[in-house]
Each structure stands twice: as C-alpha cells, then as structure tokens.
Curated annotation (Swiss-Prot):
PROSITE patterns: SQUALEN_PHYTOEN_SYN_2
Cellular component, GO, one term: membrane
Phytoene synthase as annotated region, ranges: 249-593
Keywords attached to this entry: Carotenoid biosynthesis, Isomerase, Membrane, Multifunctional enzyme, Transferase, Transmembrane, Transmembrane helix
Protein name: Bifunctional lycopene cyclase/phytoene synthase
Main location: membrane
Top-level taxon in the UniProt lineage: Eukaryota
The family this protein is said to belong to: In the N-terminal section; belongs to the lycopene beta-cyclase family.
Function: Bifunctional enzyme that catalyzes the reactions from geranylgeranyl diphosphate to phytoene (phytoene synthase) and lycopene to beta-carotene via the intermediate gamma-carotene (lycopene cyclase).
EC number(s) per entry: 5.5.1.19, 2.5.1.32
UniProt catalytic activity: all-trans-lycopene = gamma-carotene; gamma-carotene = all-trans-beta-carotene; 2 (2E,6E,10E)-geranylgeranyl diphosphate = 15-cis-phytoene + 2 diphosphate
Annotated source species: Podospora anserina (strain S / ATCC MYA-4624 / DSM 980 / FGSC 10383) (Pleurage anserina)
The protein's annotated pathway: Carotenoid biosynthesis; beta-carotene biosynthesis; Carotenoid biosynthesis; phytoene biosynthesis; all-trans-phytoene from geranylgeranyl diphosphate: step 1/1
Subcellular location per the Swiss-Prot or TrEMBL entry: Membrane
Length: 593
C-alpha cells in the first residue's frame, strides 16, 4: 500500500509529537522555538546528503508500494518528514525534563572543572574519535559493516564537535536531562522501527549490514542510528542551553538582552573566554537558589516556569527579601533589630539616593563592612537598578513591625501590633504587597518595558492587592505555628468579637472561636483574590502563566483550609497541599493563562 510509511507517522510519530506539544505548551517560550527550529534546520541539512547517498547506493530501499511518491534527492517525502519529527520529539523530551534546572549554576565548572568532569570530557572525546575512526574503517573495508560504518562516520564527528564545545556543561547536568531524553525517544523509535521493518515499509539491503538484531527484526544498524541521532539532538540542545546560560547569567558581558537572544549573541557567548565569567555571581545565584528551595516550595516550583534573566532576577529578589527577613527575625534584642534595619535602610539609600555607578565600590565596601559573609551575595546581586525603591523601604518597615512581637514595651498594642483590620492590611501591604509589586516591576522590565504608564500602575496596584491576599492565606495557615512563637496576626478587634484576647490564642490556638476567625480571614483573602485575579490577565504573556501559577499554588492552601476545617493534613501546624494537587493547580493555571 502506497501509504504504509505515511501511516507510520500517522499512527506513531505525529500522535506522540502532538501529545508532547500539549504537555509542553504551558512552558513553551519563544527561546524554545528558536532552539528547536535551529536544530531542525541543522539536522535536516546534515542528514539530507547522507540519506541521499544511502538510497542512491542501494543500502537503504523503499518498496514502491510503501511510499506516496514525491522525493527530494531520491529521499521519499515521508523520510524527510522523519528528520523533522524525530528532532522535534526528542527536543521536547529534553525541554520537559530540563525545565526544572537552573542552567547558570552549571557554568561553575567551566573555568576550573573538577577532575572527574575534565577527565570525563577527555574520555568522551576519545570514545567519539574511536567510533568515528571505526566507522571510517568499516566504510573502507566494505561488505557487511558498510552501513554501520556510514552511521558512525557521519554522526559522531558532529557529536564530537558539540561535546568539545559543551562537554563540561553536559557532564555537569543531571542524567535526567541528558541520558533520559536520549533513552526514552530512542526506545520508542526502536519499537516503531521494529514494526516498520516487520511490515516491509523500508529495508536494509543484505551485504551492507552485519545481520545482527537488537531484538525481533530490528537491525543493530537501525538501533545505532536512532541512538546516535538522539545523542546529537540532546547534545545540540545542551549547547544552546550553555550559550543561553552565559548570556543570561552575566550582565557584564551582555548588558541588554532582548526577549529572544540574537544569533550574534549566541556566537559571542560561544567565544566568551571563561576567564571573563563572574564566578562570584554564580556562587551568589547558588546561594539564592538554596534559600529559595529551603524557604518556599511554592515559589520554587513557580520560579522554574520563568525563563531567562527574568528568572534570575526573581531568584535574586527573593533571596534579598528572605535575607532581610532573617536578619531582623533572628535578632535577639530590640537594639539588634534597630541595628539591622538601619543598615538595610542605608544599603537602600546608597542605591537610590546616590549615583549607583559612581558608588558601586562604596556599596560593596559597605556590604563587606556591615553584613555577615552569608548575607553578602544576596545584597550584592539585588537587581536594584530595575526595581522601584518605595516597596523595598516598605518591606523593611514590615519586618520591623514583625519584630514588635518579640521586642516591645508593656502595652498590649505594642506586644500585639495587629490591633485592627487596617493594621492587618497595612502589615500585608508591607511584607507581601511590596513583593508582588517588585515581581511585577521585574516582569515589566524584562517582558514589556514600553508598557503604557496607566497599565503599569494598574498592574502594580493589582500585584499589591494579590500580595495581601496571599499573606492573609499565610496567616490563616500558620495560626498555630505563630502562636508557638508568641505571635498573633489576627486583629485584636476581631478577637474581642469572639470573646478572646491575643493571650488566649497564644495559649490555645485551636478551637471553635479561632476557626471562626480563620474562616473570616480566608473570606477576606478570597475577596481580594477575586478582585485582583481577572486583572492579572494584563501581565505580559511570557510571564502571565508562571505568575498566575505562583498565585494559584498559594491560594490552593486557602482552599485546602476551607475544605478540610479541623481535619487538614498538618506539618508542624501548617496545612499542606499534596504534591499532585499542587502540580495540577499549576498546570490548570498555565493552560488558562
């Protein structure tokens, strides 16, 4: 039947490609289109003459009744499509499995690699050279090893090239993003090829093959072909990721980066000397990621959905916020609180009340002088030049307000500063609304810097409102944990309506009256959420899905609290969202954004 080869695509390759496209759609960025499109062009042009030679030499044949008819340089159109669809499928597997990774961290081995990485690269290069030479030998010898030789001599020089330029990076990556995206599509295509060979859709002529089968009727040469080509695709994707990581991680090398880096920038990153890499910045990014993973599972999951320099700056912003919070929160006296907040205010003054470029050395000297070593990277790499100042000052003010629970005078309003709903809202504005505003400021800067002022103001306001909503959920979740620390964020006026005092909540943080107040706080949170959520659709598309995903994962905590009052799964008194439900929430948000 003339449609046999076409049916292979209709039954096996196109459905898989479609499924992977649907799965990957929410995280797809224009950078991914650039990567996949470039690899498809390269693979098509590299495979075309080689495949044409195989057919013209009668090594590979297609029964006339198995193909539709149109050919290019003797290659059936179905085979040409295979070049494209295989590259697309394997690239999608790579993207999906690599998305959680933060690639800039893997640049740390480029200048002075560990011995195992340096040795691994040399061994890998040696293996690829040996396979290439063996392939050449088989071609020269002719006979049964010809086809295998043609595969090895064609594929592995390309693999050697990519491994030479990115071997250290590839070896540093986890196996889940290198070996796994090679193995899964390879095994799948082995099974497809086994079916096609069994049906006679294509054939390898006897006399040019060894006659060994991996299983069934799958010739060892065909198995080697799919393995080798998928290695090429994954190596090619890794090369792209290395160059993109260089572009995004080092502002001193690439001060301005468009939404999609240009081909010229990729070339420039290729020829950047590793001595120019700012490894201190990479170490700072590593510290920031460690803070993020340890302190906020929801934000860590959401952050992996962002791309490029925006993702980096969001991580650095979070690291600063967490560091400032910890410095104040870990203080042992009111004097120490005042000392840290004064230093943080002065740090911000140096950025916003003086010429930053002229005072860069002064800022770094002040960081070294005033802060402990573990705090330096979070302060040094805060992207202050593209952040508004007012939310940062207000954030520190919020941390000061928090400290009143531990260090206060004898009055009740000083010991429990959340005296009424206005004070609660103000506190939420300080510690969470500001963070929402800062995140949106980064999104606008990286995704749509030309955004009209009116829309900017609207998004800033919406982000503040949503930040307060999330903080209310946080307070509702942590009533027990906060009470253990002597803190009560429920407004004192609300407590009086239930016949309680803050001391009652500290002593007995569970019970009917406290649950009534939890419900009330969640109700206020969802009112703010309902007000702000529709307006979040005005966020630039590249960041809309991840931003909404971050919001929804946190609001899901509130939904769990509402659904399972008195019976929620607790972790030190905190309601948790099961991992599967959290993932489902993120995916729903991404698809609907």
């Amino acid at each position: 039947m003339a449609y046999d080869y076409a049916l292979v695509h209709l039954k096996y390759t196109i459905p898989l490609a479609a499924l992977l496209t649907v799965i990957a759609y929410p995280i797809f960025h224009r950078i991914h289109f650039l990567q996949i499109g470039s690899l498809i062009v390269v693979s098509f042009l590299a495979t075309l003459p080689w495949d044409s030679y195989l057919i013209r030499s009668n090594i590979w044949t297609y029964p006339p009744d198995a193909i539709i008819g149109p050919r290019l340089y003797g290659i059936p159109i179905e085979e040409l499509f295979f070049f494209v669809i295989q590259t697309y499928i394997t690239s999608l597997f790579y993207i999906l499995l690599s998305k959680p990774l933060f690639h800039p961290l893997y640049l740390s081995t480029q200048r002075n690699p560990p011995q195992r990485i340096a040795r691994g690269k040399v061994i890998g290069q040696g293996i690829l050279v040996a396979l290439t030479l063996y392939g050449v030998h088989q071609i020269r010898t002719g006979g049964p090893g010809t086809y295998l030789g043609l595969i090895l001599a064609w594929a592995f020089p390309f693999a050697l090239l990519t491994f030479t330029v990115a071997g250290r990076f590839i070896l540093t990556l986890p196996l889940t993003s290198t070996v796994v995206p090679i193995i899964i599509p390879t095994v799948y295509l082995w099974l497809v090829d086994e079916l096609a060979l069994g049906r006679g859709t294509w054939a390898i002529e006897s006399g040019t093959k060894l006659g060994w089968c991996l299983f069934g009727v799958l010739d060892i040469e065909e198995a080697t072909f799919f393995l080798a080509t998928n290695i090429l695709i994954v190596f090619g994707m890794a090369v792209f990721d290395q160059y993109l990581a260089i572009i995004f991680a080092f502002p001193h090398l690439f001060p301005k980066v468009p939404r999609s880096p240009t081909p010229l920038m990729l070339v420039q990153s290729r020829f950047s000397n590793t001595k120019q890499y700012d490894l201190e910045r990479i170490a700072g990014l590593s510290d920031a990621v460690t803070r993020l993973k340890a302190k906020s599972r929801s934000f860590y999951l959401a952050n992996s959905l962002f791309t490029g320099r925006l993702r980096i700056d969001l991580i650095l912003l979070y690291s600063f916020c967490r560091l400032a919070d910890d410095l104040v929160d870990d203080s042992t006296s009111r004097t120490e609180v005042k000392s840290w907040t004064t230093k943080l205010y002065k740090f911000l003054d140096l950025h916003y009340k003086s010429d930053v470029k002229a005072n860069k050395a002064r800022i770094n000297d002040y960081i070294d002088e005033a802060f402990p070593p573990e705090a330096k990277s979070a302060l040094k790499y805060l992207p202050a030049t593209i952040l508004p100042s007012q939310p940062l000052y207000q954030l520190i003010e919020g941390f000061e307000l928090d400290s009143q629970f531990s260090f206060h005078d004898s009055s009740e309003s000083a010991k429990y500063p959340i005296v009424d709903e206005d004070k609660l809202n103000y506190y939420g504005q300080c510690v969470a609304g500001t963070v929402g505003e800062l995140c949106v400021a980064l999104i606008i800067e990286h995704c749509e810097p030309e955004m009209p002022d009116e829309r900017k103001k609207m998004l800033m306001s919406v982000s503040r409102t949503m930040g307060v909503a999330l903080q209310y959920v946080n307070i509702a979740r942590d009533i027990v944990v906060d009470a253990e620390m002597g803190r009560v964020y429920l407004p004192t006026t609300w407590l009086k309506e239930e016949g309680l005092t803050p001391e009652d909540v500290v002593a007995h943080p569970r019970g009917k009256h406290v649950e009534n107040l939890r419900r009330r706080l969640l109700s206020e949170a969802f009112k703010l959420y309902d007000e702000a959520r529709p307006k979040m659709n005005g966020i630039p598309k590249e960041a809309r899905g991840p931003m909404i995903g971050a919001v929804e994962t946190y609001m899901e905590i509130g939904r769990v609290l509402r659904e399972l009052e008195g019976g929620v799964e607790l972790e030190r008194g905190k309601a948790t969202v099961p991992g599967g439900r959290r993932l489902k929430t993120v995916l729903k948000a991404l698809f609907s954004a």
